[in-house]
């Protein structure tokens, strides 16, 4: 793969005002994307965004660049990332663009693209866009310029799509649900979906002001949701992230239910209904408890690199329909093309209704193993973990764990840090000591 200057594993991301998250770069990017994606028949591109204040500025720049390349932008206003993937498909648009930095703070922003099928752009297309950025910007003839318009009722269309993934014979009349929208893009979607299906809904963090997205709320910070579920004596709580592609749940006792537990419930039910195609894709960070629980049900499980893009690649390669990251990206290819927090939540409600059990009872079947992560910084070579000494150290730890746990060593993709992760069916203090010993030994072998 070529070295890419701007695109990372999940589009382009950074601090607003610093290159490349600037209005002049976004204008050029809109033009470059338009030039590369142009086909004769369709000149439409859908643009959505989350609730960051900077989204308005960046959207205007992007739409000007697209217009210069002869593309008309269809604007949805604040909408979840998975909604843009869906609308791109239904409008037969050339591409969908989301302006968002997902679970990052408000002063960051970013951009990601979907192709005509609602999937992430291929590496080769991203590289072609980067190459086009090097060329001077030229306008098409005046008569061919694009113009922006709003999609009327984009939210309503997506709400109906979400509801359509829930069995029509079921409703949520007996549920009291707390929903935390992270002051993000699902603020006008998630509460409506749940209310229209009959639930009693208590909404928190559903009042975005451009600056409060992900601030002490949402899927990466569930403290407020846990308190609220207990105070309201709700049946459960759901937390989405700023752009709506992650889901974390909370049971009626205030316990966290993460992506590993959620995907287990959905896969087990699909297996029970004889609708499971293949198995489940997780990541290197998926808890071993998930692997063991799926093993008991004879459901195949494979691990991908961390990142929803890699999970999807593995799913497509093996023909699996269910994949997830423990952080709450749940990909259900029988329902949609990308991770979708709202749709994943509805599938969990379906499992609860079909089994007539609480979320807490359902989760008791999967025992997550205690997991300890020790990080330490290092300087120098990326391949430090490749030595024979470290390989034999890993073997030693694995024999200590005797098949009831695992050790993972990896260097961070974003900072000079080595991560030592150990999880095992053991007391937490035993694992912590073991992880710290391993970290010390690696440090010694480096210097």
Curated annotation (Swiss-Prot):
Cellular component, GO, one term: cytosol
UniProt feature coiled coil, ranges: none
Entry's EC annotation: 5.4.2.10
Key words, A-Z: Isomerase, Magnesium, Metal-binding, Phosphoprotein
CDD domains cross-referenced by the UniProt entry: GlmM
Catalytic reactions of this protein: alpha-D-glucosamine 1-phosphate = D-glucosamine 6-phosphate
Modification comment: Activated by phosphorylation.
Bound cofactor: record note: Binds 1 Mg(2+) ion per subunit.
Active site per the UniProt annotation: 102 (phosphoserine intermediate)
Cofactor: Mg(2+)
Record-level Gene Ontology MF annotations: magnesium ion binding; phosphoglucosamine mutase activity; phosphomannomutase activity
Modified residues (Phosphoserine): 102
Ligand binding (Mg(2+)): 102, 241, 243, 245
Function: Catalyzes the conversion of glucosamine-6-phosphate to glucosamine-1-phosphate.
Family designation: Belongs to the phosphohexose mutase family.
NCBIfam families (alphabetical): glmM, PRK10887.1
Protein's name according to its UniProt entry: Phosphoglucosamine mutase
Source organism per UniProt: Hamiltonella defensa subsp. Acyrthosiphon pisum (strain 5AT)
The gene coding this protein: glmM
């Amino acid at each position: 793969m070529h070295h890419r200057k701007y695109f990372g594993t999940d589009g382009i991301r950074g601090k607003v005002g610093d290159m490349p998250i600037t209005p002049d770069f976004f204008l050029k990017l809109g033009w470059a994307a338009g030039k590369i994606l142009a086909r004769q028949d369709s000149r439409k591109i859908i643009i959505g965004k989350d609730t960051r204040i900077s989204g308005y500025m960046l959207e205007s720049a992007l739409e000007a660049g697209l217009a210069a390349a002869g593309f008309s932008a269809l604007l949805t206003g604040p909408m979840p990332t998975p909604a843009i993937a869906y609308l791109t498909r239904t409008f037969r648009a050339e591409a969908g663009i989301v302006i968002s930095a997902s679970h990052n703070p408000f002063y960051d922003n970013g951009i990601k693209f979907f192709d005509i099928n609602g999937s992430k752009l291929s590496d080769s297309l991203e590289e072609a866009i980067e190459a086009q950025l090097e060329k001077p910007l030229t306008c098409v003839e005046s008569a061919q310029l694009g113009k922006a318009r709003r999609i009327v009722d984009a939210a309503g269309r997506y709400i109906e799509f979400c509801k359509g993934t829930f069995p029509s014979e079921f409703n949520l009349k007996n549920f009291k649900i707390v929903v935390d929208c992270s002051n993000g893009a699902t603020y006008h979607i998630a509460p409506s979906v749940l209310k229209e299906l009959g639930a009693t809904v208590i909404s928190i963090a559903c009042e975005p002001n451009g600056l409060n997205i992900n601030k002490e709320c949402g899927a990466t910070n569930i403290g407020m949701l846990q308190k609220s579920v207990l105070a309201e004596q709700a049946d459960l709580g759901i937390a989405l992230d700023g752009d709506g592609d992650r889901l974390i749940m909370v049971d009626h006792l205030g316990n966290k239910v993460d992506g590993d537990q959620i995907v287990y419930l959905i896969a087990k039910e699909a297996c029970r209904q004889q609708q499971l195609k293949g198995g489940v894709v997780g990541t290197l960070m998926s808890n071993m408890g998930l692997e063991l629980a799926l093993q008991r049900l004879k459901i195949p499980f494979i691990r991908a690199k961390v990142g929803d893009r890699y999970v999807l690649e593995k799913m497509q390669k093996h023909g699996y329909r269910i994949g997830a990251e423990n952080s709450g990206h749940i990909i259900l290819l029988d329902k949609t093309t990308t991770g979708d927090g709202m749709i994943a939540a509805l599938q969990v409600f379906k499992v609860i209704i079909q089994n007539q059990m609480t979320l807490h009872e359902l989760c008791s079947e999967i025992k997550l193993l205690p997991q300890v992560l020790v990080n330490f910084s290092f300087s120098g070579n990326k391949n430090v973990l490749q030595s024979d000494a470290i390989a034999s150290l890993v073997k030693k730890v694995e024999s200590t764990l005797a098949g009831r746990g695992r050790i993972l060593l990896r260097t961070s993709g974003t900072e000079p840090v080595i991560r030592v992760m150990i999880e095992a069916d053991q007391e937490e203090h035993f694992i912590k000591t073991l992880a710290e010993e391993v970290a010390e030994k690696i440090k010694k072998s480096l210097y």
